[in-house]
Amino acid sequence: MCIRDRIKNKTTSVSGMGIAGEVDSPVPGQFESMEATLNWNTMYSYATKMMNPNKNIQITLRAAMQNDNKNGGYTYKGLRVVLGGRPKELDPGKLKRADTMGSTTTLEVTRYLMEVDGTTVIDIDKFAGRYYVDGEDMRAEINALI
């Protein structure tokens, strides 16, 4: 399985006197639609089970990231990504002799958590209004006012 996802802030265009042109300014804690596409070699039963629109899907992905150290060797860090959301699309792929099917499942991501070596670096929950980067609440000042 291979996964591809992207986090993109909503932006608003700022222009006016004293600004040389326009600036696309991110709106803190607001995100565009986030999708994750899971690529499968074949049509697994759990890929079709994910298409139940009445269930929220949560997937935990783990990896070991290899880094170069200053002595010419390697160090390793653990990576954990948790995705939560609803199914958007299922592409069963193609049937071709002696080839993979290339099936995909696309999710609308509403929950995104990334940890590196057990430390949370990104934590987004669209429905709960959570947005943390390196442990700092990006919405704290806004939430205190509303």
Predicted regions: what they are:
Residues 28-32, 53-55, 73-77, 97-101:
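A generic structural micro-feature
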